[in-house]
A protein has these predicted regions:
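Conserved alpha-helical substructure of the radical SAM core
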Residues: 1-92
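Radical SAM enzyme [4Fe-4S]-AdoMet core and its adjacent flexible, acidic
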Residues: 15, 96-98, 103-186
Length: 186
């Protein structure tokens, strides 16, 4: 997708040229386990764009040691992928939805049908036995809108947990000070 606020798509996001190799990820997970960490969160960019790499990372982490969760836009999370994530002991999947209005969500995400796929992804997560979280970015642009209230109602109605992320001027929104919540956004 081409989400309007993604750090990865920003000019400053171009600096990431190297990634941790599998050996380094395994070492990091082993150290986290030894130190008593119990959660492992995978996010950033879109993990499901490279499913082979994602499952290599999960194998290196050995998720059975942790409460394992990941965040996705849901575009590539179909029923088979949800089952595979559950088989790999992923406990929770957060799917980002920006509005219950399909057109608004798709505009923010930069791709048609992204809303439909995100909604379906949450159902696939729930059906696979993982904890579905509706991931909502909250900013001045939506804090007091009916769209925001509809998202919260939808999450409650479907028995999803809700994860609220406060918008900050970063990534493609680096200079967008108007996105930050202010005193009127309560």
């Amino acid at each position: 997708l081409r989400c309007k606020y993604c750090f990865t798509n920003s000019p400053k996001g171009d600096h990431v040229k190297e990634y941790l190799d599998i050996k380094a990820i395994k070492k990091l997970a082993d150290e986290a386990d030894e130190l008593g960490y119990f959660e492992f969160d995978l996010q950033g960019g879109e993990l499901l764009l490279q499913p082979k790499k994602l499952f290599e990372v999960l194998e290196a982490i050995r998720p059975e040691r942790f409460y394992m969760y990941l965040t996705t836009n849901g575009y590539y999370l179909d029923k088979a992928m949800a089952k595979k994530l559950a088989d790999y002991k992923v406990s929770r999947v957060s799917v980002s939805i920006d509005s219950m209005d399909e057109k608004i969500h798709d505009e923010i995400r930069g791709r048609k049908e992204s809303w439909k796929r995100a909604v379906e992804a949450l159902k696939h997560v729930q059906d696979a036995g993982m904890d579905p979280y509706l991931n909502i970015t909250v900013g001045h642009y939506n804090a007091n809108t009916e769209h925001f209230k509809q998202l919260l109602d939808y999450s409650k109605d479907k028995k999803y947990k809700t994860l609220l992320n406060v918008a900050v001027p970063s990534g493609m929104w680096q200079n967008a000070e108007n996105i930050i919540c202010n005193d009127n956004d309560r």
